[in-house]
From Swiss-Prot:
Protein name: Large ribosomal subunit protein uL13
Gene: rplM
Family of the protein in this entry: Belongs to the universal ribosomal protein uL13 family.
SUPFAM superfamilies hit by this protein: Ribosomal protein L13
Single annotated GO MF: structural constituent of ribosome
Gene source species: Prochlorococcus marinus (strain NATL2A)
NCBIfam families assigned to the protein according to its UniProt record, in alphabetical order: rplM_bact (TIGR01066)
């Protein structure tokens, strides 16, 4: 009879991956990164454990969306005060805080539980091509999606 094995926390091998978001489609990049963060690319994936890897996303300001989403997609946040709803388009948020767009897309694809919050801490998003994690020697993660040409 076969037994299901559950990996112990010290047996999980965590790696660092680097993703270049330049000319990548937002949703396609987010699904690949969320899968790596979750650990679904590993043979010892366990749904209730954090078996994923660290992911560094660079060039967040150069991410693309298809269609008219750059003008029509809205990002909402609320201060918690009456009348405190702030609405911003993709284009405006991309010029102001491009990291937030990528973070929000990936966070929405992770579990909405304590595990998802723990997984989200392993995501590092940066504007530009520089990042402070060179000591971890991240591997380049090539995405299956093709780049958007315009």
């Amino acid at each position: 009879m076969n037994k299901t094995s559950v990996p112990s926390p010290d047996s999980i091998d965590r790696q660092w991956f680097l993703v270049d978001a330049e000319n990548q489609t937002l949703g396609r990049l987010a699904t690949e990164v969320a899968s790596v963060l979750r650990g679904k690319t590993k043979p010892n994936f366990t749904p209730h454990l954090d078996t994923g890897d660290f992911v560094i996303v660079v060039n967040a300001e150069k991410i693309k969306v298809t269609g008219k989403k750059s003008d029509q997609k809205l990002y909402r946040r609320h201060s918690g005060r009456p009348g405190g709803m702030k609405v911003e388009t993709f284009k405006a948020l991309q010029s102001r805080i491009p990291e937030r767009i990528v973070e929000k897309a990936i966070k929405g694809m992770l579990p909405h539980t304590r595990l998802g919050r723990q997984l989200f801490t392993k995501l590092k998003v940066y504007k530009g091509s520089d990042h402070p994690h060179s000591a971890q020697e991240p591997k380049i993660l090539s995405l299956n999606s093709e780049s958007v040409t315009k």
